[in-house]
């Protein structure tokens, strides 16, 4: 969709403002996340610079954000551990959901490189962060009784054809001599 008309304005009395298209929701969220992380680094004791930031600092940041979560994650000793829909309230803490953390790390990983960080030194892509996210995902799945297992791709097991598929397809499409094009149509009679 084009937000700016390319046709000249024929009315000399009207004034039109050309406004650049606004950033996407993703870009805005990425900018907010990046600013939050940079502020976290500034407020860290001792303050951290971006080049000295490691995967361990990213994990500290994720644990800090956990206190603002809105997803109930049951303790292992909670009576509702493993139940997807608990019947009553419990004192278990609210945490950041795994999906939110995963999306946050993806946005911060992109923002790090956009702000001049070298891809090979990206702390958001470190092994420690990937392992942490996997552990959070697995624990939350158990605590909530939800499975995050990957769905396996279906393998199409057909009998091997003696002719290459292209040649077979071409033969099926060409009508036999004296046969109409409608002969291959189911329900047609010749």
Swiss-Prot record:
Q: What's a Pfam family in this record?
A: ALOG_dom
Tell me a GO cellular component: nucleus
Keyword Lipid biosynthesis set for record: no
Q: Where is the composition biased (Polar residues)?
A: 1-26, 180-190
Segments forming domain ALOG: 25-152
A molecular function GO annotation: DNA binding
Q: What does this protein do?
A: Probable transcription regulator that acts as a developmental regulator by promoting cell growth in response to continuous red (cR), far-red (cFR) and blue (cB) light in a phytochrome-dependent manner, at least during seedling development.
Protein name, entry field: Protein LIGHT-DEPENDENT SHORT HYPOCOTYLS 1
Report the source organism: Arabidopsis thaliana
């Amino acid at each position: 969709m084009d937000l700016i008309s390319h046709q000249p304005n024929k009315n000399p009395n009207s004034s039109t403002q050309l406004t650049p298209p606004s950033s996407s929701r993703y870009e805005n969220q990425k900018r907010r996340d990046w600013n939050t992380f940079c502020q976290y680094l500034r407020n860290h004791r001792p303050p951290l610079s971006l080049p000295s930031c490691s995967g361990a600092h990213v994990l500290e940041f994720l644990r800090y954000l956990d206190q603002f979560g809105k997803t109930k994650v049951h303790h292992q000793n909670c009576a509702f551990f493993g139940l997807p829909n608990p019947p009553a309230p419990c004192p278990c803490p609210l945490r950041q959901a795994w999906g939110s953390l995963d999306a946050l790390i993806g946005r911060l990983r992109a923002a790090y490189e956009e702000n001049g960080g070298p891809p090979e030194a990206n702390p958001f892509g470190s092994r420690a962060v990937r392992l942490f996210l996997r552990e959070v995902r697995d624990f939350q799945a158990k605590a909530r009784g939800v499975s995050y297992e990957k769905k396996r791709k279906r393998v199409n097991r057909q009998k091997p054809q003696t002719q290459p598929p292209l040649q077979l397809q071409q033969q099926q499409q060409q009508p036999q001599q004296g046969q109409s094009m409608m002969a291959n149509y189911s329900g047609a009679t010749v």
